[in-house]
Regions:
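Surface-exposed, polar helix/loop patches in the mature regions of secreted/periplasmic/lumenal proteins
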Residues: 78-149, 154
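Immediate post-signal-peptide N-terminus of mature secreted/exported proteins
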Residues: 24-72
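Short, aromatic- and cysteine-enriched interfacial helices/patches
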Residues: 17, 25, 57, 130, ...
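Flexible helix-coil transition and linker loops at the boundaries of alpha-helical arrays
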Residues: 73-77
Protein backbone atom coordinates (compact mmCIF):
# COMPACT_ATOMS: atom_id res chain seq x y z
CA UNK A 1 0.00 0.00 0.00
CA UNK A 2 2.82 2.42 0.90
CA UNK A 3 4.61 1.47 -2.30
CA UNK A 4 1.46 2.32 -4.32
CA UNK A 5 1.18 5.71 -2.58
CA UNK A 6 4.79 6.50 -3.46
CA UNK A 7 4.22 5.57 -7.10
CA UNK A 8 1.02 7.61 -7.23
CA UNK A 9 2.74 10.60 -5.63
CA UNK A 10 5.61 10.31 -8.09
CA UNK A 11 3.23 10.14 -11.06
CA UNK A 12 1.32 13.21 -9.86
CA UNK A 13 4.57 15.12 -9.32
CA UNK A 14 5.82 14.16 -12.79
CA UNK A 15 2.57 15.22 -14.42
CA UNK A 16 2.70 18.59 -12.65
CA UNK A 17 6.30 19.03 -13.73
CA UNK A 18 5.46 18.34 -17.36
CA UNK A 19 2.53 20.81 -17.29
CA UNK A 20 4.74 23.50 -15.76
CA UNK A 21 7.47 22.80 -18.30
CA UNK A 22 5.13 23.02 -21.27
CA UNK A 23 3.53 26.19 -19.93
CA UNK A 24 6.95 27.82 -19.88
CA UNK A 25 7.55 27.06 -23.53
CA UNK A 26 4.91 29.35 -25.05
CA UNK A 27 7.34 32.09 -26.05
CA UNK A 28 9.91 29.63 -27.39
CA UNK A 29 7.24 27.79 -29.38
CA UNK A 30 6.02 31.04 -30.96
CA UNK A 31 9.60 31.92 -31.87
CA UNK A 32 10.27 28.44 -33.26
CA UNK A 33 7.12 28.21 -35.38
CA UNK A 34 7.45 31.80 -36.56
CA UNK A 35 11.00 31.14 -37.70
CA UNK A 36 9.87 28.07 -39.64
CA UNK A 37 7.05 30.03 -41.34
CA UNK A 38 9.29 33.01 -42.14
CA UNK A 39 11.71 30.72 -43.97
CA UNK A 40 9.05 28.63 -45.73
CA UNK A 41 8.83 30.04 -49.25
CA UNK A 42 5.73 27.93 -49.96
CA UNK A 43 3.75 30.09 -47.50
CA UNK A 44 2.06 33.28 -48.68
CA UNK A 45 3.91 36.54 -48.19
CA UNK A 46 1.21 37.77 -45.79
CA UNK A 47 1.52 34.64 -43.65
CA UNK A 48 5.28 35.10 -43.53
CA UNK A 49 4.89 38.79 -42.60
CA UNK A 50 2.55 37.89 -39.73
CA UNK A 51 5.12 35.35 -38.53
CA UNK A 52 7.84 37.99 -38.77
CA UNK A 53 5.80 40.35 -36.60
CA UNK A 54 5.31 37.61 -33.99
CA UNK A 55 9.02 36.81 -34.05
CA UNK A 56 10.01 40.47 -33.70
CA UNK A 57 7.43 41.15 -30.98
CA UNK A 58 8.59 38.19 -28.91
CA UNK A 59 12.26 38.97 -29.43
CA UNK A 60 11.63 42.57 -28.34
CA UNK A 61 9.68 41.46 -25.28
CA UNK A 62 12.32 38.93 -24.25
CA UNK A 63 15.11 41.48 -24.71
CA UNK A 64 13.33 43.84 -22.31
CA UNK A 65 12.28 41.31 -19.66
CA UNK A 66 15.03 38.73 -19.78
CA UNK A 67 18.16 40.05 -21.50
CA UNK A 68 21.15 37.69 -21.80
CA UNK A 69 22.93 39.54 -18.98
CA UNK A 70 20.21 38.44 -16.56
CA UNK A 71 20.31 34.84 -17.78
CA UNK A 72 24.09 34.67 -17.40
CA UNK A 73 24.11 36.21 -13.92
CA UNK A 74 25.13 33.44 -11.53
CA UNK A 75 23.58 35.39 -8.65
CA UNK A 76 20.17 35.52 -10.31
CA UNK A 77 17.38 34.39 -8.01
CA UNK A 78 15.53 31.33 -9.36
CA UNK A 79 12.16 32.65 -8.16
CA UNK A 80 12.74 35.97 -9.91
CA UNK A 81 13.78 34.22 -13.12
CA UNK A 82 10.74 31.95 -12.98
CA UNK A 83 8.46 34.94 -12.41
CA UNK A 84 9.97 36.67 -15.46
CA UNK A 85 9.61 33.54 -17.57
CA UNK A 86 6.00 33.14 -16.46
CA UNK A 87 5.33 36.80 -17.32
CA UNK A 88 6.94 36.39 -20.75
CA UNK A 89 4.84 33.35 -21.51
CA UNK A 90 1.63 35.05 -20.39
CA UNK A 91 2.45 37.95 -22.70
CA UNK A 92 3.38 35.59 -25.55
CA UNK A 93 0.13 33.67 -25.22
CA UNK A 94 -1.92 36.88 -25.08
CA UNK A 95 -0.15 38.24 -28.18
CA UNK A 96 -0.85 35.06 -30.10
CA UNK A 97 -4.52 35.12 -29.11
CA UNK A 98 -4.72 38.86 -29.89
CA UNK A 99 -3.50 38.33 -33.44
CA UNK A 100 -5.91 35.42 -33.92
CA UNK A 101 -8.82 37.53 -32.63
CA UNK A 102 -7.76 40.38 -34.93
CA UNK A 103 -7.68 38.10 -37.96
CA UNK A 104 -11.05 36.62 -37.01
CA UNK A 105 -12.62 40.08 -36.60
CA UNK A 106 -11.19 41.20 -39.94
CA UNK A 107 -12.64 38.13 -41.67
CA UNK A 108 -16.04 38.69 -40.06
CA UNK A 109 -16.17 42.45 -40.62
CA UNK A 110 -18.05 43.95 -43.50
CA UNK A 111 -15.81 45.65 -46.03
CA UNK A 112 -16.91 49.11 -44.88
CA UNK A 113 -16.01 48.29 -41.23
CA UNK A 114 -12.56 46.80 -41.75
CA UNK A 115 -10.84 50.15 -41.31
CA UNK A 116 -12.60 50.56 -37.95
CA UNK A 117 -11.56 47.08 -36.81
CA UNK A 118 -7.94 47.73 -37.80
CA UNK A 119 -7.98 51.13 -36.09
CA UNK A 120 -9.34 49.70 -32.83
CA UNK A 121 -6.79 46.91 -32.71
CA UNK A 122 -3.89 49.20 -33.66
CA UNK A 123 -4.84 51.89 -31.18
CA UNK A 124 -5.23 49.34 -28.39
CA UNK A 125 -1.60 48.24 -28.83
CA UNK A 126 -0.49 51.85 -28.76
CA UNK A 127 -2.57 52.74 -25.69
CA UNK A 128 -1.46 49.80 -23.54
CA UNK A 129 2.30 50.23 -23.40
CA UNK A 130 4.38 47.93 -21.25
CA UNK A 131 7.72 49.74 -21.13
CA UNK A 132 7.05 53.27 -22.42
CA UNK A 133 10.07 52.74 -24.64
CA UNK A 134 11.49 55.99 -26.02
CA UNK A 135 12.85 54.26 -29.13
CA UNK A 136 9.65 55.01 -31.02
CA UNK A 137 11.23 54.40 -34.42
CA UNK A 138 11.75 50.78 -33.42
CA UNK A 139 8.58 50.06 -31.41
CA UNK A 140 6.39 51.75 -34.03
CA UNK A 141 8.14 50.15 -37.02
CA UNK A 142 5.09 48.02 -37.87
CA UNK A 143 2.44 50.49 -36.75
CA UNK A 144 2.08 52.66 -39.86
CA UNK A 145 3.79 50.34 -42.30
CA UNK A 146 1.22 49.66 -45.02
CA UNK A 147 3.29 46.70 -46.23
CA UNK A 148 2.57 44.82 -42.99
CA UNK A 149 -0.67 42.91 -42.42
CA UNK A 150 -0.15 43.32 -38.66
CA UNK A 151 0.35 47.00 -37.84
CA UNK A 152 0.72 46.90 -34.07
CA UNK A 153 3.05 48.61 -31.62
CA UNK A 154 5.83 46.36 -30.29
CA UNK A 155 5.84 48.09 -26.88
CA UNK A 156 2.57 46.54 -25.78
CA UNK A 157 1.13 44.89 -22.68
CA UNK A 158 -0.56 42.10 -24.59
CA UNK A 159 -2.55 40.81 -21.61
CA UNK A 160 -4.16 44.20 -20.95
CA UNK A 161 -4.62 44.88 -24.66
CA UNK A 162 -6.36 41.54 -25.17
CA UNK A 163 -8.63 42.20 -22.18
CA UNK A 164 -9.53 45.60 -23.63
CA UNK A 165 -10.35 44.20 -27.07
CA UNK A 166 -12.46 41.47 -25.52
CA UNK A 167 -14.48 44.10 -23.66
CA UNK A 168 -15.74 45.64 -26.92
CA UNK A 169 -19.25 44.76 -28.09
CA UNK A 170 -18.40 43.56 -31.59
CA UNK A 171 -22.01 42.91 -32.53
CA UNK A 172 -22.36 46.62 -33.30
CA UNK A 173 -19.39 46.73 -35.67
Amino acid sequence: MIYMKKILTLLVALSLFSVKSSAQDVLNEILRTSDIIINDTTKSLNTRKVALFKFDAMTYLRSKILPPVVMLDKKANADTLNAKIRFLNEQAYAMSVYISVYQKRMNEAKEKNRYLVTSLFKQATYDHKLFNDTDTEYVMSYYDNKECPIQFCLDCDWVKTLAFIRSIDWSKI
